[in-house]
Amino acid sequence: MSRRNAAVKRPVLPDPQFNSRLASMMISRLMKHGKKSTAQRILSDAFSLISERTGGNAVELFETAVKNATPLVEVRARRVGGATYQVPMEVRQERGTAMALRWLVTFSRARNGKSMSQKLAGELMDAANETGSSVKKREDTHKMAEANKAFAHYRY
């Protein structure tokens, strides 16, 4: 590990189109090979699809979807005397949001659909309705933490 000072965390600026920090973070997660304009187009197309289907505000639905997919606890491997325990730990809000966005993108890519914007719109709507793969992943993470509650005293 580096002996230098920890790097200063740069603030995430809100996306100019949607005026949302979460949207800006999502664009960064969607981006492949530095193609930011493509990622922005995918997100804006997904938001317009959501607005058409629901008739509501797509940005609010997106924020609800991220909130529903955000885990509160996770398990982390901890080695104690030759045995590895899955130790449940609380997730900081920043990390939880990052995990939720990562899961939303991963499960959107895994969906069957025509375009990425359609797949993303479907996953976001499912997550907002507390269904969908990303919310299931959060529930599985919480179940794992609950099952390993006995090892909570190994927290670091």
UniProtKB/Swiss-Prot annotation:
The keyword tRNA-binding applies. One of the primary rRNA binding proteins, it binds directly to 16S rRNA where it nucleates assembly of the head domain of the 30S subunit. Is located at the subunit interface close to the decoding center, probably blocks exit of the E-site tRNA. CDD domains: uS7_Bacteria (cd14869). This is Small ribosomal subunit protein uS7. It comes from Prochlorococcus marinus (strain AS9601). InterPro entries: Ribosomal_uS7, Ribosomal_uS7_bac/org-type, Ribosomal_uS7_CS, Ribosomal_uS7_dom, Ribosomal_uS7_dom_sf. Part of the 30S ribosomal subunit. Contacts proteins S9 and S11. Belongs to the universal ribosomal protein uS7 family. GO terms for molecular function: rRNA binding; structural constituent of ribosome; tRNA binding. SUPFAM superfamilies: Ribosomal protein S7 (SSF47973). NCBIfam families: rpsG_bact. Keywords: Ribonucleoprotein, Ribosomal protein, RNA-binding, rRNA-binding, tRNA-binding.
